[in-house]
């Protein structure tokens, strides 16, 4: 059984990155093959940010971004990049775990996020869905 973990770990947010890390480690301890689904609504720029988000803060937060990217690279098993819902049909696991950071966020900026983070992309697949 292979499990895909879906959350917003690509945001440079401590809670989201640690949630992905903790769920992945727990599944590892249970002997369950898993990886974090690296879904984003649009391709990240060279700094690991969604283009045009917080431009004024980018210069002052480069070290923070670098540290998040290093942590993800060294401590998370990530799938290949899936960018936008046009690639969502390619995502295939036996089970999906949805992180609480995606369930409880009050903001949905893109329809792509709702499509992904409410399991719309896999509703017709026989996989188990856990949130």
Task: Pin down the residues of each PLM region.
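Aromatic- and Gly/Pro-rich donor/ligand-binding loops
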Residues: 5-14, 18-131
């Amino acid at each position: 059984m292979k499990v895909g973990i879906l959350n917003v770990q690509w945001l440079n947010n401590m809670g989201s990155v640690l949630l992905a890390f903790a769920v992945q480690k727990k599944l590892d301890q249970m002997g369950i093959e898993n990886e974090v689904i690296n879904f984003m609504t649009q391709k990240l720029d060279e700094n690991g940010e969604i283009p045009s988000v917080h431009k004024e803060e980018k210069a002052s937060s480069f070290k923070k971004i670098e540290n998040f990217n290093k942590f993800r690279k060294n401590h998370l098993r990530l799938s290949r990049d899936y960018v936008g819902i046009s690639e969502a049909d390619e995502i295939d696991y036996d089970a999906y775990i949805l992180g609480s950071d995606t369930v409880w966020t009050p903001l949905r900026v893109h329809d792509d996020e709702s499509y992904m983070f409410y399991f719309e992309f896999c509703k017709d697949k026989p996989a188990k869905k856990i949130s």
